């Protein structure tokens, strides 16, 4: 895939990640009803959290909720081959905040995340609102 197509594809993934923010879990389920998804609830002592994982192209979109409102979206890339191109796209499109280690988007933030406990070392891009 050439650079222009890669950037366009990544831009679309970011758009999908942004589209879930501020939505309820039921609204997100309706928006992505034709996609493969996993809905889960994590319970431990007094702590409870809910999440939705949705397969989108070559990525998995994870929606993180607080009071049933998605406040964070995480795009796990299934293939890290093009991550350099995606980082270059972010560097050329968004201002980078070195102090907080994140890109500043028009209405939020974007962070590159590599989980320490993921044996596959899948890269993820995390979006949050301002």
Q: What are these model-predicted stretches?
A:
Residues 1-101, 129-130:
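Short helix/turn-capping signatures at newly exposed starts of structured segments
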Residues 60-66, 102-106, 110-117:
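Broad, structure-driven detector of short, well-ordered beta-strand segments within folded domains
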Residues 110-130:
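Glycine-rich, aromatic-bearing surface loops/beta-hairpins
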């Amino acid at each position: 895939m050439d650079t222009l197509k890669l950037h366009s594809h990544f831009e679309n993934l970011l758009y999908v990640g942004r589209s879930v923010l501020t939505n309820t879990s039921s609204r997100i389920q309706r928006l992505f009803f034709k996609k493969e998804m996993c809905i889960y609830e994590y319970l431990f002592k007094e702590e409870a959290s809910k999440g939705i994982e949705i397969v989108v192209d070559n990525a998995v979109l994870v929606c993180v909720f607080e009071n049933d409102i998605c406040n964070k979206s995480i795009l796990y890339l299934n293939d890290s081959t093009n991550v350099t191109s995606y980082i270059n796209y972010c560097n050329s499109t968004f201002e980078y905040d070195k102090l907080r280690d994140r890109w500043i988007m028009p209405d939020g933030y974007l962070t590159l995340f590599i989980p320490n406990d993921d044996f596959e070392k899948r890269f993820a891009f995390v979006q949050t609102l301002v």
